[in-house]
């Protein structure tokens, strides 16, 4: 059986202005690729909008003979539009030519296919409540309850005795790895190993585990003080991080309903960069975000605040922008706003932003109340760093996230942009995602 090859196919500008049932390619190209088999996987690429459509499983024998009677050098291949022509952001790096074909490898094919799946399919939502409590005999009892609201109602409930000492041992090893490595390439197998232990401890019920891994979903976590520190992003099954198919949202059941934001310019973004001698790549990060906005012709206005802040300066920015991107140092008890001020939490916001992206270390620490306070104040989505992040090491995640979020011709939410960015970078970083998704998806 011949291997099915995968391709990106270009058409011309006029093709995408109408609903066409055929792809046009030169006969000479068809003759070359048909040697490898009659079936190919293909995406359609629109250069003007930097969008990719598909995927199509194309039978090269299924030609539109009525059109192929023309005496020109083109063949017309019938297609079925699998995904209703909703495309994802994509930049073709090779020289663009109309009616051409570019071969891609299997890894690229599945990455692009997964991205289109995400954009075009409804995402399952699961609310997951988890706690560790003492029974009358003083034993630790682990409890969880899961309620899935889409695509159908599904409820799972479980409780059992919990070996807290074993968990502490696994968590201690997680912290050791987290603090000693900025890139997970060397330690990915160790993270998967301890993630597999945690999965067996936390989700022991096989039927529910299989259900959880069936399709892409967002799992909204509601955790008590004993389970908040569980590193959900490293949970692993079958030698893979389950975060490859699941976004764990650290919501603690706050801010599930949208906020009524008043007097807010929804096309404004602020970048807060706190000056520090040890942060040398902030200018590069700022330039990348600005270049994304220019390249995509987005109407977003971006203001830069490259200075130290006090509490009131910081709150003023939060209340006047729809997106706030923060570049600073993170500590176990908060983020640095100035040399003598660490921000641990905020109080109420009159006009909260839709999205706050905190590019700082250690945002997962239990003593750091900033994430939870932002969500409680009405911020829809907070994306935050986990563990030790070397300066500038994950800039490609940030670039991919905003490229997808700001794409003028594709309306996607923050969860979809987060996951598409993960698909982009996971082949370069073997480890788990080093940015957490907190809150609920938001359109900006």
Where are these predicted regions, by residue range?
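Cysteine protease catalytic core and zymogen-processing segment of caspase-like enzymes
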Residues: 309-312, 319, 330-380, 397, ...
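Non-catalytic, solvent-exposed interaction/assembly segments
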Residues: 117-220, 224-227
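Short acidic/histidine-rich active-site segments
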Residues: 380-393
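Contiguous surface segments at macromolecular interaction interfaces
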Residues: 2-6, 14-27, 53, 61-120
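Short coil-to-beta transition motif at edge beta-strands of beta-rich domains
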Residues: 34-46
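Flexible, low-complexity linker/boundary loops enriched in proline and small hydrophobic residues
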Residues: 118-124, 192-197, 234, 332, ...
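Caspase-like cysteine protease fold
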Residues: 243, 250, 255, 337-351, ...
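A domain-level signal for caspase-like cysteine endopeptidase catalytic cores
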Residues: 166-186, 190, 196, 201-204, ...
């Amino acid at each position: 059986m011949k291997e099915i090859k995968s391709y990106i196919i270009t058409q011309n500008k006029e093709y995408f202005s109408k609903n066409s049932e055929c792809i046009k390619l030169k006969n000479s190209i068809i003759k070359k690729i048909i040697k490898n088999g009659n079936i190919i996987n293909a995406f359609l690429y629109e250069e003007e909008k930097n969008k990719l459509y598909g995927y199509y499983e194309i039978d090269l024998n299924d030609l539109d003979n009525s059109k192929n009677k023309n005496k020109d050098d083109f063949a017309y291949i019938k297609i079925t539009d699998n995904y209703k022509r909703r495309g994802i952001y994509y930049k073709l790096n090779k020289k663009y030519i109309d009616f051409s074909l570019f071969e891609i490898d299997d890894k690229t094919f599945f990455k692009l296919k997964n991205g289109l799946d995400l954009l075009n399919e409804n995402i399952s939502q699961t609310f997951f409540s988890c706690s560790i409590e003492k029974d009358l005999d003083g034993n630790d009892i682990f409890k969880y309850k899961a309620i899935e609201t889409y695509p159908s109602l599904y409820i799972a409930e479980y409780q059992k005795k919990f070996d807290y000492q074993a968990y502490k041992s696994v968590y201690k090893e997680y912290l050791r790895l987290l603090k000693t490595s900025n890139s997970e390439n060397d330690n990915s197998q160790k993270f998967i190993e301890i993630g597999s232990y945690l999965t067996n401890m936390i989700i022991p019920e096989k039927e529910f585990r299989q259900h959880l891994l069936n399709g892409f979903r967002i799992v909204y976590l509601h955790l008590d003080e004993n389970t908040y520190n569980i590193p959900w992003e490293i949970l692993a099954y079958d030698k893979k991080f389950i975060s490859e198919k699941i976004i764990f949202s650290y919501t603690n059941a706050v801010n599930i309903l949208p906020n009524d934001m008043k007097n807010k310019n929804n096309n404004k973004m602020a970048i807060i960069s706190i000056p520090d001698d040890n942060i040398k790549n902030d200018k590069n990060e700022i330039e990348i975000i600005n270049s994304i906005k220019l390249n995509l012709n987005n109407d977003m206005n971006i203001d830069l605040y490259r200075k130290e802040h006090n509490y009131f300066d910081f709150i003023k920015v939060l209340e006047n922008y729809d997106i706030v991107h923060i570049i600073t140092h993170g500590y176990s008890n908060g983020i640095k706003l100035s040399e003598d001020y660490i921000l641990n939490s905020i109080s109420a916001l009159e006009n909260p932003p839709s999205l706050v992206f905190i590019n700082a270390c250690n945002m997962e620490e239990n003593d750091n109340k900033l994430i939870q306070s932002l969500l409680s104040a009405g911020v829809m989505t907070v994306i935050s760093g986990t563990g030790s992040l070397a300066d500038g090491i994950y800039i490609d995640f940030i670039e991919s996230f905003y490229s997808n979020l700001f794409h003028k011709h594709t309306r996607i939410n923050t969860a979809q942009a987060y996951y598409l960015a993960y698909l982009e970078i996971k082949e370069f970083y073997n480890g788990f995602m080093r940015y957490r998704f907190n809150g609920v998806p938001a359109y900006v």
